[in-house]
């Protein structure tokens, strides 16, 4: 397959769609290290969760773990879905090729050492993102933090829907409605897979999830636009829809 993916154009969709080619900065690590058990000297996943915990003043570490996972899921879905809708190809985001700076922010946090285009169908997008990253990420988080599989699945669905919605909005602004429609159609197909089925309801570009990421528990936090709650629940309801 020829090199079809224009990373500069992809990044113009929005910050979550940004991907740079190269070895990354001095703080970047391959995602294979992120999913591995924490070594004695370096722990990129724990560092990121701790950074989110401090930044949000999260009341417990599982809230920070949820928000950190949601952010990574949004980055990965956006890059893959955007590439597939724009170019009919998706970059190989193999955990040995994709590097991440746990102290960075978009667009400077993701680097791909070698851009290798793969077919841009939903099956490949799922394999690249869900099988290649979200499942090992969820396993690593659940091994270390008290966080439910259902909550993490809900975050994955929310992140996918958000990527499709942002891509669709960009496509409308740019007069490229075909790109937006391809993104929505692919998202709908991905939600039909057992891994995401039941995480929420996708209606065009609108989505309502069936679980909560727990962000509302942070000081000054509220419910997200796609949350299952209309307003932050009382403390007695904290576990009602968190997993």
Give the positions of each predicted feature.
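A eukaryotic "domain-start" boundary segment
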Residues: 1-43
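Hydrophobic, aromatic-lined core segments that form the binding pocket/scaffold
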Residues: 35-204
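Phenylalanine-focused residue identity feature
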Residues: 16-17, 31, 35, 47, ...
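Cys/His-clustered metal-coordination modules, chiefly Zn-binding fingers
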Residues: 173, 177-243
